[in-house]
Amino acid sequence: MASTSSSQPEKNRSHVPLCRLGTEPVSRTGAAEEPSGQRECYYYAPATSPHHHHHHHHQHHHHHRLKQHHRHHHHHHRLQHHHHHHQQQHNHQNQQMQHHWPSRLGPIGPWLGAMTAYRLLTISLLIGILCPHHVQGADPKFDPTTRMRLVLVPADAQVNSVIYRLRATDEEFDYPLTFEFVGDASASTVKVESLPCTKYNSVCQANIVLQRRLEPGRYYDFQVSVKDTKGGMTTQLCSITATNFTTPHDLIFPHKPGIIMIPEDAKRGTELDYVIARKNPLFQKPVYLELWGSPLFAIRQKIVSSETTEGTVFLLGPLDFEKQAMYHLTILANDAYAEPGQDSRNIAGMEIVVIVQDVQDQPPVFTSAPPVTKLPPGILPGDKILQVHAEDGDKGNPREVRYGLVSENNPFTSFFDINETSGEIFLMRPLEDIAFITHVGDPVLLTVIAEEVKVGRDEPPALASTVQLAFFLPDRTNSPPYFENDHYVSRVDENAPQGTALTFVDPYVPRVYDDDTGKNGVFSLTLLNNNGTFEISPNVAERSAGFLIRVRDNSMLDYEQQQSVQFQILAQELGPATNLSALVNVTVYINDVNDNAPVFEQPAYSVELPENMTAGTKVVQVLATDPDSGLGGKVRYTAILGYLNTSLNLDAETGLITVSTNKHGFDREVMPEYHLYVEARDMDGEGNRAQVPLIIKLIDVNDETPIFDKDLYEFILTHDLMGFTTTAVIHAEDKDATAPNNEVRYEIINGNYDNQFVLDKVTGELTVREKIHLRSKKNAKTRRRRQAGSDDEDTDIFILTARAYDLGVPVRFSTTTIRVYPPESRKRSVKFVVPGHNPDKAKTEETLSALSGGKVYIHNIRPLSPDEPGAKDIPAGNPGIKERSVVTATVIYDSSSVVDISEIQQRLSHHNNSYAIMPQDTSSTDTQYKAENKVLFWLLILLATLVALTILILLLCCICSWCPLYGAATKRIVNISRTEDDVHLVHREMANGKQTKSVQVAEWMGRRDAWSAEKPPDTRTKPTRWEFHDGREQLDEDVGRGQDIGEGDRRHIQSAEEQQRRVRIKHNRTAKDDLHLNFHNSRTNLINDRDVYMEDVIENRDLAGDREHITRTRVNRQEYARRKQYDSEVRHIDDDSMRRHEIDRGSDIDFNTAHNSLKSKRELFIKDGNVEILQLMTRDKTRDGLNLDDDNIYVNVPLKPAGNLSHPQLLMVDNTGKEILMRRFIEEQPDGKQIIREHYQIVPGATYIQSMPNEVQQGSTLKGDTFPLGKSGPNSIVYSQLEPEVKVIHTQPVQAGEGVSLDQQMQPAVSNQSLTHELEHSLKQQNALLRQILMEKEKLENAYTQHEVALETQSLPGQSMAIGTQTDCDAGTQTEGFDGVLDPEISLAKPSRRRARSENDESMSEDGYEYVRFNPPNSPEGVYWIKRRRTKKRPRQPRKRIVMVEEVKRKIRTPIKEEEEVQERKKRVPPKKPLRETKTSILRKQLSDESRKDQSRNGESQTGNRHRSESDSHNRDMFMEITDSMDELASPGSHSIRKIQVEKYYKHSDGDFDEDDTEYSIDSDGDEIVIRTNYPSRAQENERYRRQERTYAEPENPVDRKRPARKSSPTDSQPEAMPRLSRRDSSKRGSRKQTSSEPPHNRVSISKYESTVTENGRKLMSTSTEIVGSKRSLTDRSYQSETELAGLEHEERNVPKYMEWYYNKKKSSVSGRTSTESSKSQPSSKKKVGAAEKRVSKTRITAQPKDVEEYDETGGRYKPEPAPRKSPPKGSRLLKEDRALNKQHKPKIETDTNHPLLQHSEHRFERENALEVPAAPTKLPHYMYPETPPHAAAGGKESKSGRESKTSKEAKPKPSPIRENEVKVSNSKIYVEHRGTGHPTQKQLNASTLEDDHDSGIAMNSLLNSLGRRNPIAEKKSVFSIAYDDVSRVKKINSGGESPQYS
């Protein structure tokens, strides 16, 4: 072994293995070789370093690897050869070892080689022993030469002496090394002292110190270990024994110094002494000396002989005797002499003592010198004051000290003396002398010097010290203060202002003194007898002070009252034992100031004068006085002021007033008295002025004559000649002011010859005394008249003269003439000149009769000749008068003829001619009027026809399945999505309808609505979120009754009550909803839903207040009626179902509480409005979210029943997952179990995706196919493959929009009964729907593998991504606004409280998003989701997924991006999907692209087309909706305008609206919008549509494009979100608050918008419906619906194309919505999602509002949101928070930042960046992933781009609650992705999706908060469930509750 070891070390050196410390440390006892073998160490040993004894050990072991590598070398090669070879092997085979080698080889190698290796060679045993210490990498090693195997120590070894020196090294230089004993056996005998060691040392050493005497012959065993800084440790066994031997100190140290003396001033380097040490004869090494004990000394050694070494001790540093006078030093001799056999110590020690000698270098030190001394009062000169003492500082040889006083610069030295030797100080002069030159209280300073006495010539110079003493003189006697003067005098002006200072002029000096010092010198100054007039400062002074007196109150300074003021100043000492004071008088003389105005003797002067006074008449004399002195008291009268003042004279000196002229103008008849003012001024007319009233009362004079009102009175006698035809009264008036001057009397003075007439003298009435006899006979009179042509009545006329006189003096009178005519004839022949050539005789007679007041008989009519009288009188400016006719007629009057001027005016006006007055040519005038009226009449007819046509078209659209507005399925579903509640109800109700899935979903959503978000435990209830009673909330009602009500009604659910009512309605209408849902859930009954929605829209508008957009449309009225109906229903629902659900969930109470609790529960729930959305984390992403996704068993049963293949795609992702989510959610929620029960009950048919928030989240993630309809609302997460379900989600957003009222409504919906029933019903329906969905999914998978994939991508992305985002990635997507929504949808059983964002995110992530995007926002899932979504498998079908993703997007920006991903996924998926799905996607894409182009002009058409394409069911619903839209869009122009408006609106919303609107339109918006459109007034609807169009058109660029792109794959999902946006945005584009906070309002707006569209031309409805349908289709088509929704809106003008696509799409994926198709397309994920996908489909539809929006956001903006899904708490928080926030600050919440999810950094990040960082795609929905993968890169970029475009618009508007920002962000990002995907709708979807997702989560919360309402969606988790069926409807919900959901 020795040889081996020796060779091995060489090898080791050569190969320098890095001892990878072997398997285990070598035991000390083990043989050296064995330990080395055991230890696998890689040693660095340079070939030259011989000391690596370890290396051979390492070679032996080398971790087996080294062993094997090196072993052969080991044996065959010499050290160096082997070194190279081995090293090479190591390099190749053991790179790890090599890594360590270089570092170790470099430094340690050489050292080891030099020292250790050398010793190893010499002593192989030592080497072996050393090796055993196990080195990990490189453990420290003991120096083999210091191995204490057995140390012999003589028994006389001193205690505390060093008996051995240990050394150790470390190849890795991990110094310092520490030595210590292992165990405590040896602790009492010896101790180990590690010597200082640094990392720069090459060896570390330790001393073994003896602790006690050794017993001879006894063995002491112990173990010593050495550790490096890295923890490597080596131990060695040590043994010592004592020998009976005496240490030969003289042999060891032949010369050793004794005591060394050194002066303290010795210089550095001074040699003190030397020592000689003998070496050990056994060693070759010489002795090595060490000096220990003080750093001031060192030892220098040299070898003087072969046996000895000499060491010289020298000084290193300065010494100071005063500091230390003695040093004990120890000299250690290494390897010193030891007696062989008796002593084997390797070290010997000796001690030396150094004594420092003192040197005279210190001055004296005062030991006694009191610094302060108070001199006693009675001290006299010669008395001793004190004594000082000093000593020499050098204690070694002190010298004597002498004292003295320093007189330099000290005036007091002469007053004192000091004893030179004793230090006593004496007073030399009296204290008074000292006090005379000092200030009182100042100390007397004295400096004393102490100097050493030098007694030898050679001594150092004497040193001196000084000290300063202070003496205080005794206190003086106290004296009082005193003033400079004994009195003071000053002057001040009267009324001097406050603060005026009194000035004292010579000889008065205002100073006060006190000669005392200290406290006795402090005194106060106060004023006595001052009455507060003055104040003095300072109040307190010391020694001396000047004082200042100021005016404080000038009320006493009145010269007129007193000319002077006297007071005293008191100065009083404030000392503790003194009250000495001084008092001085002050007299202040007051200077008079002209401060008084003149005062008149009387307050007013009144005089009575006759009105006829003459010049010079004295009026009055005034007198004023002034108390001021001098000129100030001299008054002049300066002016008379007032009316007629120039008629008076005023004497300036005397004040006499006289009349200045006869024409003075004073007239009693004008006014009874005149008021003037007389002014007086002092200062001789230039100073203060005063005025006094002068009243001149006039005395009336009889200067007025009675005047008759007529100069001639004419009266006609009656036929009986006994009276007059009218009362005959004459009247005269006298203007005099008073009686009797104005009393009038009458008399006849002439003409009353026969005294036949009597005149009453007072009244002036003329009467007949007796029957009058006419003078001439009637015949003659008549004859004469006829012949002369004039009356010969002179003979029959009586002419009287009457006089009127007054009673004044003198009497004044006037006269008048009275003519009395005989009885009048009743016939008269009159010629009338009338306009016209040949007037109609009968009409002319009528007109003339009216004119004349008699009966007119026309004799003849002839033209008027120019020369006839009257011909020239015709006005010149009347061109029509050229032709006139003369009508000769007889006018017969009866006894009383009446002329009605108004009738004449009417007749004339009828002819529109001034000539018509004449009975001339009435025919011409009549003709003109008739013509004008005809034009108006036909215009009205045309308008009525257009209206009827619009209504018919809307009806047809609703009826015809091929119509994108098809109301039965598509539109119905749209309604559902729009009103999440309605949608959910519709799904439930649809259980018996088209498809159990859709119906169940609707019902389920309704139930969800009923239990509202606040009931988090009831997943059903929560997903239902019926509380969104806004138009969006109408989902419940609208789904059930939403088909009837229409989207408008759904949107209309503004208040919680309404929403709850709607929930109830939805329940009531369950059968209808089911039928509709089966048909296409929302879309099937789109018309009905539209009606409902319209109704809702009106109510919502009323509730929201901003629903004006909806009212704008004609549909508004219809919607309003429907809304009222719906509202009443809804209210019932609200009260029972929703309230019960909320109560059960506790959401009504826990609207915010739930949010918190959810948050605490890992923030699994987002509180959206009243809904608590469970933020599901994707399985891979979120702890709960993942489970939730997996657990989201409740895939949205195909919202689109058989009609939508997508529905089957609503795979039950994981029943277990869903249930787990539900359980988790329930556990987390106080009412969790109940919630689950209620949720399941509520949404039996539909997948209980929402049942548990956790489940919901998982559901989203789980289902690639499931569409968490994020759009629906936080809790309305319905995993619907059909977009209609998404509409349900929209319904919740609507509620969110109308959050305040919705929340309230939602709370009522929480009723336990309703909740339980609805939950049970929903569970049943959901189960049925789930089965249907699974069946449909299978069909879709079979028929449309690619389509299914697309559907998966579309529906699942929305749901799965949303869910994933919520839980993980999906949670991120949904986290935004509707994590809860999506999640709830996914796990309907869950109360998808936070589902809105998280779930949407999750769904989106899974389906269409790559997790990439989701990751950044809230969790890795976001990233993955987004990537998945990006997958371009099904660009278009993935869009359907995008619908879900949109929901997710709404929740999280990441989800939006994910939506883009979903788009790409959908693109990828489409291959999987049947061609039809792909085709639909392509159509959508094209439509989207076209929409981008045409959206401005035909946004509505695009929407309609999109809806049409969505699915047959969707088409029907959409057709109905489109019909409505078309009605609204009656004219292309209006449509184009609307489209533009919509697009603009979207843009305005920063894409949020676009997203929302598009989503709303396509998925939920379409239906809901249409319904809402119908519901609100047409104008509102138009407005809404315009907004939508604007949104569509505008977003065309930012949002629509995104949507279109998304449309291809995520677009379907996205449109849903966009329609939501549409709804919300239209209403609140400007105010994103509405969008997010007022889902109802926005929804109403959108609804209005769509309604408007509907009214304008079915186009809007088509747009809405298309959007809805698109949304549904999206679900079916991988979110194509959403994208298409955007696309539809964009392609509104391309409606036909889009509609075709939609129709095709519908055909291809009628059963499954986009998500369903996507699910099929992506069977693997779908199968995983299986049921979940159906659920996803449902959820997708439900979530689509959110999902679409979120998807957009995920894809474009929401993609980042998947991460939010990561944090379900955020989602949950969103639901609660969003509700609360929506209520509180809806606008802000709408902002990305405001969204609760967005508020969470994760959500915001997701929103903004989620696209780029999708969560791990584990949970990615297939539909989402296919398109999402591109999202990872492209999605992220596109999402970002779209998002940036939108974000620039929307992100900048972040203030505008989430909707704008989110829409912008998500739209931009999504748009980019969509563009990449080639889906024009992506942008729109993004906007909508963003908004929708926002609505679901953040937006919804924001909207609700801003509205102060609960987030309808958030409140209605059930709504989300339903939403999956009615994706469009969910979208529409967004319009009402969009903001909350998506924003």
UniProtKB/Swiss-Prot annotation:
Residue ranges that the UniProt entry lists as topological domain Cytoplasmic: 956-1943
UniProt tissue specificity: As cell intercalation proceeds, a row of stigmatophore cells surrounding the spiracular chamber show expression of Cad86C. Expression is regulated by the Abd-B cascade, requiring sal. Expressed in a broad region of the morphogenetic furrow and in clusters of cells posterior to the morphogenetic furrow. Weakly expressed in the epithelium of wing imaginal disks. In eye imaginal disk cells within the morphogenetic furrow, expression is localized to the apical region.
Biased composition (Basic residues): 50-89, 1426-1442
Induction of its expression: By hedgehog (hh) and dpp signal transduction in the morphogenetic furrow.
Compositional bias ranges of the Acidic residues kind: 1552-1568
Region (Disordered): 1-102, 1038-1058, 1390-1442, 1458-1516, 1546-1695, 1707-1895
Membrane topology reported for the UniProt record: Single-pass type I membrane protein
SUPFAM superfamilies named in the record: Cadherin-like (SSF49313)
Compositional bias ranges of the Basic and acidic residues kind: 1047-1058, 1486-1497, 1507-1516, 1580-1602, 1754-1764, 1774-1793, 1800-1810, 1837-1863
Low complexity composition bias: residue spans: 90-100, 1709-1724
InterPro entries xrefs: Cadherin-like_dom, Cadherin-like_sf, Cadherin_CS
CDD domains documented for this protein: Cadherin_repeat
Cadherin domain segment(s): 238-366, 367-483, 484-600, 601-708, 709-832
Protein origin, superkingdom: Eukaryota
Location relative to the cell: Cell membrane
Keywords for the protein's UniProt record, in alphabetical order: Calcium, Cell adhesion, Cell membrane, Glycoprotein, Membrane, Metal-binding, Repeat, Signal, Transmembrane, Transmembrane helix
Gene Ontology BP, a term: cell-cell adhesion mediated by cadherin
Topological region Extracellular: 1-934
GO molecular function, one term: calcium ion binding
Domain description: Three calcium ions are usually bound at the interface of each cadherin domain and rigidify the connections, imparting a strong curvature to the full-length ectodomain.
Function recorded in the entry: Cadherins are calcium-dependent cell adhesion proteins. They preferentially interact with themselves in a homophilic manner in connecting cells.
Protein name: Cadherin-86C
Organism this protein belongs to: Drosophila melanogaster
